[in-house]
Amino acid sequence: MLFSKLFAPTLKEPPKDAVLKSHKHLAQAGYIYQVGSGIYNFLPLAKKVLDKIENITHKRMQEHGAQNILMSFVVLASLWEKSGRLDKYGKELLVFKDRKDNDFVLSPTLEENITEIAANFIKSYKQLPVHLYQIHTKFRDEIRPRFGLVRAREFIMKDGYSFHEDAESLDKEFLNTQSAYKEILSDLGLDFRIVEADSGAIGGSKSREFVVLTECGEDTIVVCKNCDYAANIEIAKRSKRPEPLNVPKAQLAKFPTPNTTSAQSVAEFFKTEPYFVLKALVRKVIHKDKETLACFFVRGDDNLEEVKALNALNLLGANALELREASKEDLNNAGLIAGFIGPYGLKKHVSYIIFDEDLKEGDCLIVGANEKDFHAVGVDLKGFENLVYADIVQVKESDHCPDCQGELKYHKSLEVGHIFKLGQGYAKSLKASFLDKNGKERFFEMGCYGIGISRLLSAILEQKSDDLGCVWTKNTAPFDVVIVVSNWKDEAQKKLAFEVYERLRQKGVDALLDDRDARFGAKMRDFELIGERLALIVGKQTLESKEFECIKRANLEKQTLKDTELEEKILEMLKSE
């Protein structure tokens, strides 16, 4: 490829609204062009990288038995209504009408579509298991699209779905796909982790995320310093904590506690640890057609994990869509006083009450008395009947691992893949069944598997690039080598550059010849910005010495290559990371 023919409209400066280096580099180097909020055009350089990512993905998925299909981007809204997700998914789901007043959605995910296909064409256990996948455009109407391709509204995704006759078969395919994803991300040269995760709006009994470790990441994962335990903070667990020595032993009594509305101030008032203070967190629960209140109790030195809290509510059958912090008006209307909320008589004020599981058999507690400026001491939760316990706290750094007791630490991460065990939920709601070996009708067990293809461009750059521009991994760079001519007006340099260009191409090297009549410094700046893996310099000294200067983009390390061994050395360098 000649640079003069390459459509790569580089910019002098990155966009002013670009925050992440991946967004800055992709826009400035001419990889992407923004159409609107969270919507991007992929220009030739980006398309080359995307093609490489997609080819690796196709190769590994098909090696693991998955079959490639292509489904409609536009889906009937009635399918989403049948599955119950039309309302649950919220405003991120873009719904529109055609000229005949039929409702459709732009798919952010395709469980409904693929389940309908299975329902129509898979009739017998003999056709199972089957794993179908696609790489296609998706749309999610993000309220605040940001960070370039990291949080876009329109994006490219590899999504796959598997159908099984029983849970055992699903378990095998779940692990099979996990292996495929590990191979894909390893081929892409990424440093990644597999973590336990919440299933969110997709649903299902179990899910795992594939995350890239990067400080720009929107997610926090919790990892053990001693073992392989890793989980998204939304579902991370910890071992049971030891009780502090300073136990506030007291008979049950009510004490005046003026202006002590926080767990810390209550602990200081009674000269004890926040561990023994019962912290009440009231949330407004948003249902499909109503709003209620829920109160969550945790120890005073803990914080509520909102995702765990929502999941705990739904295990009670609440069918909650989301949680919002209760306002002062909400509390007043319910007859509650912020800072003094406790379990006594609380059932008449809220619809749901959940205690963190760390409070099981909790005693010597200090709790709000549901009366302004009063707390109760010496409270033993064993004296209450039918309390509901669940894991609802957010794990803290320095908490201990549930597997080995090692210390837990936080890491910022960016999700690039997610796999789910969906079970029979979608099959039941969409009436997707088959006949088993006994001729009995049964619902499919389903799995769901996704990789953010376009997001991977940003993930690679966030992990590998520097302040100068793009640094791609071995299998993702748009070109292997760029040949940079020091003085394009020198016919001898130009002639040698074309000769080298042809020699490398004959060896299968994807080379770019910078044939522009531009300053040498400007050409090198574009090399640093675009991120070809190697730059091969052709200059006056090359003509005299028959030696080339070669620069690795990853670390800007320079090497001198003799003309007689040029192709051999270039191929060696390209094979290395």
UniProtKB/Swiss-Prot annotation:
Pfam families the UniProt entry points to: HGTP_anticodon, tRNA-synt_2b, tRNA_edit
Q: Where in the cell is it found?
A: Cytoplasm
Cellular component per GO?
Answer: cytosol
Q: What is its EC number?
A: 6.1.1.15
Q: Does the keyword Cell membrane apply?
A: no
What is stated about domains?
Consists of three domains: the N-terminal catalytic domain, the editing domain and the C-terminal anticodon-binding domain.
Q: What does this protein do?
A: Catalyzes the attachment of proline to tRNA(Pro) in a two-step reaction: proline is first activated by ATP to form Pro-AMP and then transferred to the acceptor end of tRNA(Pro). As ProRS can inadvertently accommodate and process non-cognate amino acids such as alanine and cysteine, to avoid such errors it has two additional distinct editing activities against alanine. One activity is designated as 'pretransfer' editing and involves the tRNA(Pro)-independent hydrolysis of activated Ala-AMP.
User: What's the family?
Assistant: Belongs to the class-II aminoacyl-tRNA synthetase family. ProS type 1 subfamily.
Q: Identify this protein by name.
A: Proline--tRNA ligase
Taxonomy, top ranks, is: Bacteria, Pseudomonadati, Campylobacterota, Epsilonproteobacteria, Campylobacterales
